[in-house]
């Protein structure tokens, strides 16, 4: 029956039920591109032109305009089952039939005009697009299209003038010209022209012009004044631009409306340093914190002052409205994480705009006080260990009324051996608890008004973990740390841990572990009871977000130091640095210096091809009170983000290759790490990409 059905469908014509005068579109022949431009703007232009001209036919392969499956099942069903109005045949039609893609639906004339407009948007004013229709010689009701794109030479910007603005507005625009997105010699590009309108609007709004918008700016272009493919540009205000657009406004009274838990309107208020706070029954946020988040004078940058120098000499620039400050305040309220929503309103003192003052009103509602999260996972390891894990986290938001959050996390995992031999049955487990208190600011040391200029957090953390390795040992680890994270620039992130203390306790070692210890003393030293008092600093650089950065860089470096301050205290009391086995609370403490770095570079060859390279390395040097680095601080390689052909801890160090056993991974750590990856990434078709890599 199945074979008979296929034969029946194959016998159906795909053009049997086409409307009168219609032609079935069967795809495109490869596009012809003449005088292709190799500039980056030209690549973007061609990508958009290709997207505008692309139309997938029936039975297309992955949405391709040129490649199709050999069997048009959807069309066969459309033509074979169109006659059914009910029953099983109608169900088949509704589920599997494909409506024919008609040439009139593709409408190549409209697509041709759209493609020409796209070429002009990117400076190819003399570019052209044409197409040909190829009728199928076997069926005159089927046809393909082939487009020809002739890009020709692009036009370039000659000069850009500002005309038709007030003297003050023109002066502001001239002061900001050095940051212009369009300049002499660059290729004409509508995207950059739109970006320039937004930039100038932002510049004006940063010096008080609250009502200015990018839509109030337009361009006039002249290609006749300067020959040989150059455009003279004039940026002018649109006809009918309201006068209030160029008027500077200052900020007046500031007020906050904090809604109740159920959305109740405020029923009480208070004043704090000129900030009026309206609340329901009881203030949910400390007044001093609201003042810090909304302090209009705190969000200030030097560049803004330089750009506006000499513009308004009779009044303080700090009282002017600034889009930059508004954005920073909104980002600050969002980053605190305690508000369900927060809306800023700027209200003029009078509707006729006689007054130049805007009052600021913030309406906010707090989020839920508690969050809970439950995670499950199942792990399968190459040493025949399998088992489930779970973690449960409860977070209390806005603990002290200043955006702080406190969380408690419980985690556990259980593993058993999956080998066939019951005599080797081995069960391991791990249990842990941790608690963290996170402040959305730098708590100590205070960093002055710069604290308002960038995101910053302070984290206090305590934890305890019990790990059981059946037949070998139990390891108890507990400790805590204080970490400061802040990002002064979009490309730079700093993390400072001035205090990190870990205490490892080796418990219940078995005879099997004693045997292993005799064979590998370094392993025992790395696992024995010891304190790890450490300090750590991490710097991360990432310029992927920088506009126009074609080949981004990501670089992270971490420096950690352990035991040096403790050893210095002992030195004060007479014990030399070189003395070994000094104890802290009855246990030796680790002393080492650790450096770890990771550098990544992405080279974009063109829009479809790129090369990604990575080199990473690290070294840990033990000295003073330590012979061997703690096991938790040693390096290992392998896994999805490392040497991808090997699982974690299953390769090295160096050429070392231990005997195969379920515990061989314990040895495969080292004091020095150097690894590199290079990967060629390419586009196969549309959103389908491939890569070839070497680790």
What residues fall within each predicted segment?
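Amphipathic hydrophobic-ligand
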Residues: 124-129, 210-215, 386-390, 431-433, ...
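C-terminal motif of bacterial Sec signal peptides marking the signal peptidase cleavage site
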Residues: 8-11
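Gram-negative/organellar outer-membrane beta-barrel architecture
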Residues: 169-172, 305, 314, 319-556, ...
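Generic beta-strand/beta-sheet core signal
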Residues: 236-238, 257-259, 282-288, 336, ...
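Interaction-mediating elements
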Residues: 13-335, 340-344, 357
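Sec-dependent signal peptide recognition
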Residues: 1-3
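Acidic/polar loop patches that form or flank catalytic/metal-binding clefts of enzymes
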Residues: 213, 341-344, 405-406, 492-494, ...
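C-terminal outer-membrane beta-barrel translocator/porin domains of Gram-negative envelope proteins
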Residues: 270-280, 377-383, 495-683, 692-693
